[in-house]
Amino acid sequence: MVFRIASSPYTHNQRQTSRIMLLVLIAALPGIAAQTWFFGWGTLFQIVLAAITALVAEAIVLRLRKQSVASHLQDYSALLTGLLLAVSIPPLAPWWMVVLGTGFAIIIAKQLYGGLGQNPFNPAMIGYVVLLISFPVQMTSWLPPYEIAATTPDILDTLRMIFSGHTASGGDMTLLRIGIDGISQATPLDTFKTSLRAGHSVEQIMQYPIYSGALAGVGWQWVNLAWLVGGVFLLWQKAIRWHIPVSFLLTLALCAALGWLFSPATLASPQLHLLSGATMLGAFFILTDPVTASTTNRGRLIFGALAGVLVWLIRSFGGYPDGVAFAVLLANITVPLIDYYTRPRVYGHRKG
C-alpha cells in the first residue's frame, strides 16, 4: 500500500471560497452605490479598470506558473482585490494609477507569495499604500461631495478626467475640487488634520462646509453607513465572523472617546472617527480577510482591537489623515504571533 503525503492545506473547498467572495462582492453594492451618488461616475470607472487589470494580471501569472487559469479566476478573489483598491482611491485618479496599484497587488502582494491563501498581507492594501507613498498628491485629491461642490463633472467629463486629466472645457482637478465656498475641499479627516496644523480650533473647523449639518462630514457618513449595511449582510450570511469588526469599532470608539474627553480642542470626536474615511469599509471588508487575519476567536478580538488602536494613533498623531491601510498591514504582521499565543493547545498536551 502506498501512502501519499501532501503539504497543507489538507482541505480544499473552492466552491465555498467562491461563494464567500461572491457574497462580499454583493455586500459591497450599497457602498459602491453611495460613493457613486456622492462622488460621481468615477467610482464605477475605477472599479471596471481595476477588475480588468486584476483578471488580466492574475491570468498572466497563472499561465506563467502553469496553473489552471479558469478555475482560479472563478474564485472571484482577484475581482475582490481590484474592487477594494478601486473604492479606496479618489474617483478621478489617473487611469494608470489604478492599473499600477492593482497589478502590484495581484502580482507582487498575492501571486509572488504563492497565490490565494499564501499571502501574509492584504493585497489591496499593499497596492493602496504603494500608490499613497508614491503619488501622495493624486491619492489625496478627493472631490467634494456633490452637495457642496461648485462644479460636478458629467459622465463624459469624468472619463476625460481619468484618461486625460482635463474636462471638455479645459477644467482640471484643481477646479473640480473647489467647493461652494470657493475653497479647495478635502476629505473630513484630511480637513480636520490640516486645519489643526494651521492653528484653527475644532470649533472653527466644524463650521466648514464639509461638516455642515453632518455628524462626520457631508456624504462620508452615508458612505460609511452604506458599507455598514453591507457588513451586516455579511454577518447575516455568516460570510464573516463578528469578532474583528466589533472589536475594531469598539476599540476605535473607545480610544476616540477618551482622547476627545481629555483633549477636545485637538482630537477628533468618536463619530468623526467612526463615520469618516474608510472605517466601515476596513472593519467589514478589509480586516476580515480570512487569509491575512487571525484564525482563532480570541486572536480575532486582539487583531481587531490592535487595528482600532493603530487607526486612532495614525489619524490623531501620524502624518496621514486616515490610516486604515497602514493599520491593516501592521496588524497583519502580528498575526503569526497572535495565533501562536491564542491557538488552543492540543488535548492531552501540557502548556509548555
Curated annotation (Swiss-Prot):
Transmembrane segments: 20-40, 42-62, 69-91, 123-143, 215-235, 242-262, 267-287, 301-321, 322-342
Keyword Flavoprotein set for record: yes
FMN phosphoryl threonine modified-residue sites: T187
One Pfam family it belongs to: NQR2_RnfD_RnfE
Cofactor(s) in the UniProt record: FMN
EC number(s) on file: 7.-.-.-
One of the GO biological process terms: electron transport chain
Keywords linked to the UniProt accession: Cell inner membrane, Cell membrane, Electron transport, Flavoprotein, FMN, Membrane, Phosphoprotein, Translocase, Transmembrane, Transmembrane helix, Transport
InterPro entries: NqrB/RnfD (IPR004338), RnfD_bac (IPR011303)
Chain segments annotated as coiled-coil in the UniProt record: none
Membrane topology type: Multi-pass membrane protein
Assembly behavior: The complex is composed of six subunits: RsxA, RsxB, RsxC, RsxD, RsxE and RsxG.
Annotated function: Part of a membrane-bound complex that couples electron transfer with translocation of ions across the membrane. Required to maintain the reduced state of SoxR.
Entries under HAMAP family matching the protein: RsxD_RnfD (MF_00462)
Family listed: Belongs to the NqrB/RnfD family.
Name the record gives this protein: Ion-translocating oxidoreductase complex subunit D
Gene for this chain: rsxD
